[in-house]
Amino acid sequence: MRKILLPVIVILSVGIAAPAHSIPGGRYAIGDSVMLGAKANLTARGFVVDVKKSRQFYEAVGIVKRKKAHGLLRRKIVIHLGTNGVLIRASDCDTISRVAGRHRRVFLVTVTGPTKYPKIRKAQNRRMRACARRHRNTRLIDWYRHSRGHGNWFYDGMHLTTKGRRAYAGYLDRHTS
């Protein structure tokens, strides 16, 4: 019995990459309170949703690493973070794209925000655009541009109303299908 188990343990501890056909299908969404408001709408469209109020972008690095290590990271990873003020570091975005690997697609969703914070919003969205340009497996979903002019989608400039939740979930669904 030991002779059979030992090689299996050695192979697993080396961390051999899973073949593309063994990656779980579907979409895994990581977000903060903005996505939290639309969790039911996204779940109804087939997303697995991992949200936490006030989550920062850098927290997504650990989430992606853990999910991948446990074989639970889906083929498509949607990240909508950056609303809460800590600027996105290029290294965090690069790490997420690298860890996801070439058989997965990472979708970065641009942020909206109250007009009193336009510099933060612009910086976050600019950093996401740059990351998407650097990595072949990473795409930008421009929620900021799509939602402009739809004040009735937000009750405070960033958090979603009922109408906004439907629009948000539909937009993410269309751009990740």
What are these regions (language model features)?
Residues K39, T43, G82, R98-R105, ...:
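Sec-exported extracytoplasmic/periplasmic mature domains
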